[in-house]
A protein has these predicted regions:
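Extracellular glycan-modifying ectodomains
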Residues: 1-400
Length: 400
C-alpha cells in the first residue's frame, strides 16, 4: 500500500501539467508571433530607432559586433514589448515599488527623474563655461539661466524614503564656481510658487509656465524691460506622454498638455545651417541660398506623434539661427540644452538676432564657437542649462 502511494506521489498532477502546457503555449505562441509579425523600425514609446536584423559577415562574427547586434535585435523586436513593459510596471506598482529605471512614481501622478550629483563632471563643465567666458572680449555680456529640475522644485512629492540628491545644494555649488563675469539667474524660488504648473507630469522638461518664470529671472539680471510690444497667445497640444513615462509606462497615467506660446505680430525666421542633431531638418523648410529655413518656431510633424515636445523647433540641432522683428538689435548667442527651447518665444520677443548652439552636436563644424562669436558679431552670450544636464553631459569640452 505504501509503495503505491509513493508511486502516485512521483507522478505529475493535472494542475502541474496544465500550468506547464500554458507556459509552453505562451512561449511558443510569442515566438511564432514574433517571427510572423514584421519588424518594427521605430518605437514611439522609447522615441528611438530599433535594431534591424543584422547581416552576417565574417568580420562581424570575428569582432563580436554581430553578436551584439543580434542581442539588440532580439531585445528590440520582442512581440508586444511595449504592452509587456506596461504590465510589468503595473505589477511593480501593486507591489509597492515607487522607483523604476531611474524614475520616481511621485505623488499627484508626477514622474520625477532621480538626481545623483557627479561633482567632478559638474566641475569640468563649469570650468569649460568659465574659460570660454573669460576668453571673450570684455564688451560681450555673459549671462546664465540655470534651471532646477523637478526633483528640486517638487521634492516634497517624492516617495519617502528616497535616495534622491539635493539639487539646491548643487545649485549653490555651481553659483560658487562660476566666474564673476557670468551673471547667474537661478529661478528656484519663483518656480516653487507655481510648482505643479512648472513641470510636466510625464516628462523631464519644464512647461511653458516654468520657462516663462525662468526667463523673467534671466531678464531681470540682464536689466531688460518686460515684453510689451506683442500679445501672448497659446495653442495647446494634448495627450503628451514624455520620456519619463516611457521608462515606466503604466495604465491610467495622467497625460500632459504642451502650450505652444506665440507673441502675436513677431515675425520669426529660423535657419538650420548645420543638419546635425537629434531630428531631421523640419519638412516645412525651403532652401534659401543653400540653407534650410522656415517661418515660426513650431514644427507640425511631431504634433501627431508621441514626441510632441519636438514641436518646439523640431528638436535640437548643432546650430540654428533666428531673425525676428523685436526691437533689440543685439546679436545673441545661446549655448543650450533642450530646456532652452521652451524659453525661445520670450527670447524671440526680446532679441532680433539669435544663434543657438547645442554642444552635443556642434563639434567644431566649420569654425569653433569662439570663431563663430567673432565672425557673426555676437555681443551677448547666454548659457541656458538645467542642472541635471550639467551633471551628466560630457560635450562641454567642445566649447572653444
Amino acid at each position: 500500500m505504501s509503495k503505491k502511494k509513493q508511486k502516485n506521489r512521483s507522478l505529475p498532477g493535472t494542475g502541474s501539467i496544465i500550468t506547464s502546457a500554458v507556459f509552453l503555449a505562451l512561449v511558443f505562441g510569442f515566438s511564432l508571433a514574433g517571427i510572423a509579425s514584421p519588424d518594427r523600425k521605430f518605437s514611439e514609446m522609447e522615441n528611438r530607432s530599433l535594431q534591424q536584423a543584422p547581416k552576417v559577415s565574417f568580420e562581424g562574427i570575428k569582432n563580436g559586433s554581430f553578436t551584439e547586434e543580434i542581442e539588440s535585435y532580439m531585445s528590440d523586436q520582442i512581440f508586444l514589448k511595449d504592452e509587456l513593459v506596461t504590465m510589468k510596471t503595473g505589477a511593480d506598482t501593486v507591489l509597492g515599488k515607487r522607483f523604476m529605471n531611474g524614475v520616481y512614481l511621485a505623488d499627484d501622478d508626477f514622474y520625477i527623474q532621480d538626481f545623483q550629483e557627479n561633482s567632478q563632471q559638474i566641475k569640468t563643465n563649469i570650468d569649460c563655461l568659465n574659460e570660454f567666458a573669460k576668453g571673450l572680449d570684455n564688451n560681450i555680456e555673459v549671462d546664465m539661466l540655470l534651471a532646477p529640475n523637478a526633483s528640486c522644485v517638487l521634492y516634497d512629492k517624492l516617495p519617502a524614503p528616497n535616495q534622491c540628491g539635493d539639487q539646491h545644494k548643487t545649485a549653490e555649488d555651481i553659483r560658487a564656481m562660476l566666474d564673476p563675469k557670468i551673471h547667474l539667474a537661478y529661478p528656484e524660488e519663483a518656480l516653487r510658487t507655481e510648482a505643479e504648473e512648472c513641470y510636466y507630469h510625464t516628462d523631464h522638461h519644464w512647461t511653458s509656465q516654468g520657462a516663462e518664470l525662468g526667463y523673467s529671472a534671466l531678464r531681470q539680471i540682464m536689466e531688460l524691460p518686460a515684453i510689451q510690444k506683442y500679445e501672448r497667445s497659446v495653442r495647446e497640444l494634448d495627450n503628451f506622454y514624455g520620456t519619463l513615462y516611457s521608462k515606466a509606462p503604466r495604465t491610467g497615467a495622467q497625460s500632459d498638455t504642451i502650450d505652444l506660446v506665440t507673441y502675436e505680430g513677431n515675425a520669426i525666421t529660423v535657419r538650420y545651417p548645420v543638419a546635425a542633431g537629434d531630428h531631421e531638418i523640419p519638412a516645412e523648410c525651403t532652401e534659401v541660398n543653400g540653407i534650410p529655413q522656415k517661418e515660426g518656431l513650431f514644427v507640425k510633424a511631431p504634433e501627431s506623434t508621441k514626441d510632441k515636445y519636438a514641436a518646439l523647433m523640431g528638436g535640437n540641432f548643432a546650430l540654428t539661427e533666428i531673425e525676428t522683428n523685436a526691437d533689440s538689435n543685439e546679436h545673441v548667442l545661446i549655448l543650450k540644452d533642450s530646456y532652452a527651447n521652451a524659453v525661445l518665444p520670450e527670447l524671440c520677443a526680446q532679441f532680433s538676432h539669435i544663434s543657438l548652439i547645442d554642444l552635443r552636436y556642434y563639434h567644431m563644424q566649420e569654425e569653433s564657437v569662439s570663431e563663430y562669436v567673432k565672425s557673426h558679431g555676437i555681443n551677448r552670450v547666454i548659457y541656458i542649462y538645467n542642472i541635471d544636464f550639467l551633471n551628466t553631459d560630457n560635450n562641454f569640452v567642445w566649447l572653444e
